[in-house]
Amino acid sequence: MRTLWIVAVLLLGVEGNLLQFNKMIKIMTKKNAIPFYSSYGCYCGWGGQGKPKDATDRCCFVHDCCYGKLTDCSPKSDIYSYSWKTGIIICGEGTECEKKICECDRAAAVCLGHNLRTYKKRYMFYPDFLCTDPSEKC
């Protein structure tokens, strides 16, 4: 389900934050978010529940928590500015929401890059119904 939603968004030509986040992930991991992170574990992709499966999935859990704190922002659609140089992502100027959203995405992309060694193919396209452990608090 998570994969279908992300593919639908991309097919509709949305130019917002999800595409920017995808680019950040590509910069830090050298992998495309789709298919590698669009439905990985219990938290990478749309939604999330249960206990993160590994450090890679925990990056997505923390990212979800970060977005959850931005109650007055639109983190999945607001466009922000950022740049990168030799693998370092720098969030640019903008509204407070844009800066905070960018920082959530930057931190998650950096986390995914730092945890490439924990990535396990068995958690790609992981079904939600297997995420039954009690969810952790942010």
Curated annotation (Swiss-Prot):
Ca(2+) binds at Y43, G45, G47, D64. The keyword NAD does not apply. One of its GO terms (biological process) is lipid catabolic process. One of its GO terms (cellular component) is extracellular region. Keywords: Calcium, Disulfide bond, Hydrolase, Lipid degradation, Lipid metabolism, Metal-binding, Myotoxin, Neurotoxin, Presynaptic neurotoxin, Secreted, Signal, Toxin. Its cofactor is Ca(2+). Homodimer. This is Basic phospholipase A2 trimucrotoxin.
